[in-house]
């Protein structure tokens, strides 16, 4: 059920990698709890920074934290003051030396998490949800490496009494194909009517042998424009038994009567 499961977890070890990379024996539960606390710390108060993802690597006495953000200037701060504050809080939380790396996301309009955050911000600012979804789809499809996108909003859309879900899709989004490079993002918009969940799936081509294969771009123009082949005609079925019209004597006699006048006209 590729349509239901988280696309990152569905493809772990195939096309996607873990966001926490370390090994532990007896301290496994403590490290997982610590990773959740690190991500929660970076999420609070950094909404304007546009954080796409946080990757964590551990050694025996050091923790490496990579922050992928669309606005690195907000995370770094003036003369690195904000980065120093974040590093100090992380060292206090983990009790170890922290190596903080701030990496810029080159194409934020093709990053699913950042697209979801952008739609959620518009919903919080009372923008119509359909308009916000269409605008996000149009800006994402302008990127050359995006082959398809799906945006879904769930909750009390437009202040309705009953919550519902609506989605828009453009291009291909093959969620059950394991070799497909699917980027997934989830964010919640806080509105006066309650929370609205925003989910975004972005298809960026197939990954074959560790390399991304852009199926639409690599296919020749003749293959894309080729018309679909028509299926061969099947014999007619009659009755509930599924027998064909020519498998019984009555059926053969009826078809012979129909075909005879056509032969006379040709003669």
UniProtKB/Swiss-Prot annotation:
Gene3D superfamilies: 3.30.300.20, Ribosomal protein S3, C-terminal domain
GO cellular component: cytosolic small ribosomal subunit
Region (Disordered) location: 215-267
Disulfide bonds: none
CDD domains: KH-II_30S_S3
Biased amino acid composition, Basic and acidic residues: 222-233
GO BP annotations listed: translation
Residue stretches of biased makeup (Low complexity): 238-256
Keyword annotations of the record: Ribonucleoprotein, Ribosomal protein, RNA-binding, rRNA-binding
UniProt domain KH type-2: residue ranges: 38-106
GO molecular function: mRNA binding; rRNA binding; structural constituent of ribosome
Annotated Pfam families: KH_2, Ribosomal_S3_C
Function: Binds the lower part of the 30S subunit head. Binds mRNA in the 70S ribosome, positioning it for translation.
Family according to the record: Belongs to the universal ribosomal protein uS3 family.
Subunit structure: Part of the 30S ribosomal subunit. Forms a tight complex with proteins S10 and S14.
Name the UniProt record assigns to this protein: Small ribosomal subunit protein uS3
Native species: Nocardia farcinica (strain IFM 10152)
Taxonomy of the source species: Bacteria, Bacillati, Actinomycetota, Actinomycetes, Mycobacteriales
């Amino acid at each position: 059920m590729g349509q239901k499961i988280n696309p990152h977890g569905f493809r772990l070890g195939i096309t996607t990698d873990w966001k926490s990379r370390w090994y532990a024996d007896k301290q496994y539960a403590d490290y997982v709890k610590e990773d959740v606390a690190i991500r929660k710390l970076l999420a609070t108060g950094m909404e304007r920074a546009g954080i796409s993802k946080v990757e964590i690597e551990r050694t025996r006495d050091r923790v490496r934290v990579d922050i992928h953000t669309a606005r690195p200037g907000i995370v770094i701060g003036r003369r690195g003051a904000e980065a120093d504050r974040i590093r100090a809080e992380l060292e206090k939380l983990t009790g170890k030396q922290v190596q903080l790396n701030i990496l810029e996301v080159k194409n934020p309009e093709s990053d699913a998490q950042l697209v979801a955050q952008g739609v959620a911000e518009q919903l919080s600012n009372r923008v119509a949800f359909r308009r916000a979804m269409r605008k996000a789809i149009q800006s994402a499809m302008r990127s050359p490496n995006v082959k398809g996108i799906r945006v879904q909003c769930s909750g009390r859309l437009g202040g309705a009494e009953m919550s519902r879900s609506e989605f828009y899709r453009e291009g291909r989004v093959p969620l059950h194909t394991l070799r497909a490079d699917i980027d997934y993002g989830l964010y919640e918009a806080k509105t006066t009517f309650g929370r609205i969940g925003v989910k975004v799936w972005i298809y960026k081509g197939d990954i074959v042998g560790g390399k991304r294969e852009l199926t639409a771009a690599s296919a020749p123009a003749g293959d894309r424009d080729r018309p679909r082949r028509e299926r061969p005609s099947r014999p007619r079925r009659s009755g509930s038994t599924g027998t064909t019209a020519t498998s019984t004597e009555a059926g053969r006699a009826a078809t012979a009567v129909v075909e005879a006048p056509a032969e006379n006209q040709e003669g």
